[in-house]
Amino acid sequence: MTQNHDPYSDAQALVGLTLGKATDYQAEYDASLLQGVPRSLNRNAIALTGTLPFHGADIWTGYELSWLNAKGKPMVAIAEFHLSYESLNLIESKSFKLYLNSFNQTKFDSIDSLQKTLVADLSQCAQGDISVKIIEPKSFGIQRIIELPGTCIDDLDIEVSDYSFNPDYLENSTDDKQTVAETLNSNLLKSNCLITSQPDWGSVMIRYQGPKIDREKLLRYLISFRQHNEFHEQCVERIFVDLKRFCHCTKLTVYARYTRRGGLDINPYRSDFEQPGESHRLARQ
């Protein structure tokens, strides 16, 4: 089994996070609540230095956005955030929740003013580009629930006894005599929060071109995240790197959609050949 040094065990960037600590909820706008985590913590550990082998975004959905209009009347909306993969930091989710809660008793003259505030604060925290889409209640009716595209591999009748993360499940997992272009998905992705060890439930889509991947070995690999502690974004980048390394995919997209916590869901998207389409939630989100 591959043994990896824990890149987070002595990471000073994690010491000051509010995650896992008792906190007070602020009802007045406070941008200082936002906390970033350097992406380099994970990327250095999986040899992602220099030019990255993918592009993409961390796609967040905020379901509990509320503020006051100029007359003091409460307003609500859903917000969709696209944070560039190139940002220096990812945004820590609990701090994001606390930050959004701080809008609850804060007046904004317009949705445009609210949107500009969100973009300015989040881009400053992440040290990168972010776009923000505000979905008003009049558009709630067109919000869709979908299934991930591709063939689901969860019905494979396998016996599992080891739930420790192990990329070696992908060793010798391809048939070099068959080159395919296919899309697979699984709803069995589960990892744990890096700080609190709370379960993070997700679904993942893998679209690739290259030697055909043994689906049973791929499923065992995905299941091995079950007791693995890492942030959502880091898990997706780890999956991408492992598939490139072991399966020699010539084209690859890894897209995970995690269930929401604190009114937020996180949906990391990484690809070396395509861009994310429209973001639609899954049934568990």
Curated annotation (Swiss-Prot):
Coiled-coil regions listed in the entry: none
Pfam assignment, any one: QueF_N
Protein name: NADPH-dependent 7-cyano-7-deazaguanine reductase
Enzyme Commission number: 1.7.1.13
Localization (cell): Cytoplasm
GO BP terms: queuosine biosynthetic process; tRNA modification
NCBIfam families cross-referenced by the UniProt entry: QueF
